[in-house]
Amino acid sequence: MIARARWRRASTGRWRYLAGAAFAAALIAAGGQSGAGHSVGHFPSYYPDEIRIDVADPEAAGKGLGDATMHVYVGGVPKFGGPVPVQVKSLKSLGSFLVLTFDPASPRFQSAEARCTAAHFILRRVAQGGKDAGFAFHPYPVTPYHADYLHHIDKANAATLERMKPLGWHAVPPVALDAQALGAKGKLAETIVKSRLGSIAERPDVVLEEVPIDGLVSAASVQLGSWTGPPWIKEGWFHAWRLLAPGLDAEHRPAAEEAYDRLIHGQLRGGLAERVDLERKLVAALGRGCNRVVLGYAEREEYFNESYPPGVENVVNDAIAGFNAPVFIRTVKLKEYPWNGKLHLGVPAASDSAWNPVGGFTDATARLMWTAVADPAMIPFPFNASWMPNRVQAELSKVEGRSGGIKVPADALRPRAGSGELERVGDWAAASEKVTYEVLPSPFEDGTEQGVADLLYPYAFTYRWGDEANRGANAYDPGVAAVLAPIKERLAGVKVVRVNETKHAVAEGLELIVKTPVVEVYLNGAPGDERQVANLAPPWSTVPWHLLVLMEEAVVRGWAAFSAEEAARRKVPWLDLVRDRTLIAKLQELVVQFERESYRPAPLKDLVTAEEARARWRSLRAFAEKNGHFLVANGPYRLKSWTSDTIVLDAVREMTYPLGFGTFDRFVFPPRAEIEQAVQEGRSVKLRASAAMTLKGGRGYTETKEPLLHTTARGVYPLLVVSRYLLIDAAGKVVGVDKMRWAEDGHFAIDLAPQLPPGDYTVIAGIFLDGNAVRPSARVLRVHIGAAGSPG
């Protein structure tokens, strides 16, 4: 059987584009000339006219936030001269994990029993100590900031209770508390060790380490063409894998690897219950052996000035990335000058990574800049683990059960390994998923129009640079290959179905022509929800094909390498399209040569004519001559200027930009469900909940809480209400995952199946509003089903 899931957001795509265009046409502005002599104001989905990013230490940040010369401090903790000023507010997100790591060579801790006993002593001592700012004792790797926390909440609660228990009389002495045994890495880890456990050892047997979430996630992400995978990058089980798998020994690694491999390859036939059960098994397997043990997590608290008129509003943070996320740049606006003001951001450190959109932008400051300059196909949902449409809309068809699969059209294309040349898949190709995309293009900053070749070339790049056979030709980068592997493993074919063309009159005598490519992508074994599947390999690139080709040629010629690791191995510079003046000079000469030759790479021979290629290189040459760099994209902002401590970005006021004003505004102040009551009535569990909301009124905000009913609304927006419950048997196996029944009187009901075997069960229930799965209000209930079929 083939199931279809179609999802569109009213706030994206043609509807929002037309709303933005119509609004722009209605508000004729004095500035901003647009064709035929008409003056048309454009109001896109992002606000400030300029963004300035300055490096600032905590003292400077505190002063700047206080006097509104800085609007937002991203990624750091400011220091104020006294109490936090009343006009300065903050939002919290997941900052880091606190993890114990045992030295595998230590004779004290060769056995799992010794490690687990020592870890228990340390965790209990930490739990009984005082509170440290931002630290939460939580000895489980999936936290309340993870969208899948509901799937693990009983396990997390049990782990906390277990770690608080005193050890029995037979326990091994707490050798790990010896002053010569325990080390610390990171400021918070040092504080905890000193205050709870004594001095810090110089040559320790076990180390308490603070592991920032940014580093854990960025090392697994990919920038190519603004693919932002893997799609499961915000899941708690994936973070647990990244955090704990490196410490697994030979005895405990196979079970964890098997569970992880099944999760990321979609090898599941039992539906959501089987998947959730496997996620829980993976986390359990990662904790066995106590080679690495989670103590808890630290929150990241980021500050902004909200005073009127100089402050900002409409601030959204991501539960995992904080303010360093695409949604922040696309929502934040100045209170006094929403569209023509200058936004001042502070960051704690200068960028020290190379600026290239393949293996670069790895430090926090560079990532912040790239979230503004680039425009991904989809962006992370700020308060769950799924994705929001940005430059694509999608419809998913997926095989369910034991169907023979989805036939891939014979004329669909698939890159050849090694060369990346696009070949027909032939008559016998099949897939388990088909995603049909409508792509919302816009011109690149060098003036070239985004076309089909730009959408397809990232696939060719993936198969060329992901093939180790190309190592000898300098056309292989292990780091790049690793993050592109999920795409390469699953792609079954790509077919461009058509390019729709529509005309929109935005003013008298002014007409916009909108081209919308429709592309089918065929996949095999893609896991996750519909949007996660759609975000695996969308036909999209925020950089043009000719820039990707230029970077490839620079690497093949030995001028640079995409990633820091490969640059160090080959002893060449890390490819930087902006700040490496020597490389830029070489690239300028190469562009002139390619323009003269009308150069096209082999995968594009049938998609790009010689004249089109010549025009592309000509435009890129002119862009570099004018701007002094090669960072060409088609996102909301362009790079205007830079120094070692300052980056300035200009807004792109392009009338064909497809996303109109207010596209992401709904994610400001997400509502939250609060379960007020949960009771068992026979074979049903009934719950009642309230909706806690923050509503804007004039220049201020009002906190409100009201019963969650079918008529409850968030201002003018109806609430999207999603419920979920887990049913877990006495052995700990997840035997059911489903939504609750929402009755007309507002109560939620879980109806336990009549065929449910007698015994003890755990029910976990949660309710989410507008997709907000962070820090859920959940209930864990113990239910007994009697032998006669009625609850005992």
Model-derived features with residue positions:
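Surface-exposed binding/hinge segments that line
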Residues: 2, 300-308, 315, 472-611, ...
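Gly/Pro-rich hinge or "lid" segments in bacterial periplasmic/extracellular proteins
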Residues: 31-45, 329-330, 351-352, 359-371, ...
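Extracellular/periplasmic solute-recognition and catalytic clefts
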Residues: 38-44, 48-102, 198-239, 642, ...
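Local pocket/hinge segments that shape ligand/substrate recognition
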Residues: 44-45, 74-174, 221-265, 286-310, ...
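Aromatic- and charge-enriched surface segment that lines or borders ligand/interaction sites
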Residues: 106-117, 408-474, 521, 686-688
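Append "and occasionally in soluble cytosolic enzymes with long acidic Gly/Pro-rich linkers
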Residues: 110-195, 279-281, 285, 292, ...
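Bilobed periplasmic-binding protein-like "clamshell/Venus-flytrap" ligand-binding domains
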Residues: 128-131, 171-179, 254-261, 266-306, ...
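Long beta-strand-rich cores associated with HINT superfamily self-processing modules
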Residues: 300, 304-347, 362-365, 596, ...
